A protein has these predicted regions:
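Bacterial N-terminal signal peptides that target proteins for export
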Residues: 1-8
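Bacterial N-terminal signal peptides
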Residues: 9-17
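Sec/Tat signal peptide C-region and signal peptidase I cleavage site
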Residues: 18-23
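Extracytosolic secretory-pathway proteins
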Residues: 24-195
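Ser/Thr-rich, Pro/Gly/Ala-heavy low-complexity intrinsically disordered linkers and tails
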Residues: 199-203
Length: 204
């Protein structure tokens, strides 16, 4: 062991402790439209993650949302209250360029339909729609990170969904979908004139 080894080890530990100290859960709000039916997203979080204003990098994290409900028309059943939950399949990160343009690496989500009420609640698990691939881009500023995907696809489920798979597929599957998310926090763009999003290929 050289005399530099302890110094390097201490430096590495300090770097790790500093990085973890800045990790946070960023509050998330937004709205979602699925097959033409719109509603607010339940208040969620993105993290544990940290934003570096010097580079514009938002470190790897995941969206977490609680259960929520939406009323949708279902063929043969009328207006049905759907209790659902969105979950992220794998972490993603984001980049804010010096001009404020922002993009997140591809986000794969799962939409789980937990119950439907017509009007009595009926359990539908398992009933998963995945992957729902989101390409989120937008802007970063001191007031927050605003991202959207104006046209994503909900794939069909092959789960039984409590015997209502065909009706739920008809109600949810398609391309007439959009999502907006707002991450609360200071996402001031970095100084400089390099658009890192296009250099790193986040926009592809």
């Amino acid at each position: 062991m050289t005399t530099r080894t302890p110094i390097l080890a201490i430096a590495a530990l300090l770097a790790l402790s500093c990085g973890s100290a800045h990790a946070a859960l960023f509050p998330v709000t937004g709205a979602i439209t699925v097959n033409g039916n719109s509603g607010d997203l339940p208040a969620g979080t993105f993290g544990n993650s940290s934003y570096d204003p010097a580079t514009g990098q938002l470190s790897s994290g995941s969206f977490v949302f609680p259960q929520s409900s939406v009323t949708v028309p279902v063929t043969g059943l009328g207006n049905v209250t759907v209790i659902y939950q969105l979950s992220q399949n794998a972490p993603s990160s984001a980049q804010v360029a010096s001009d404020g343009v922002a993009a997140m690496t591809p986000v794969a989500m799962t939409l789980s339909v937990l119950w439907i009420a017509i009007p009595l609640p009926i359990a539908t698990e398992p009933c998963h729609f995945s992957p729902i691939n989101l390409e989120l881009d937008g802007t970063g500023a001191a007031s927050g990170l605003d991202l959207e995907d104006r046209a994503f696809t909900v794939p069909q489920t092959t789960d039984p969904c409590g015997g209502f798979a065909s009706q739920i597929n008809a109600a949810l599957v398609g391309n007439s979908n959009s999502i907006t998310v707002h991450l609360a926090g200071d996402f001031t763009p970095p100084a400089g004139d390099t658009d890192k999003i296009f250099v790193d290929g986040f926009d592809g």
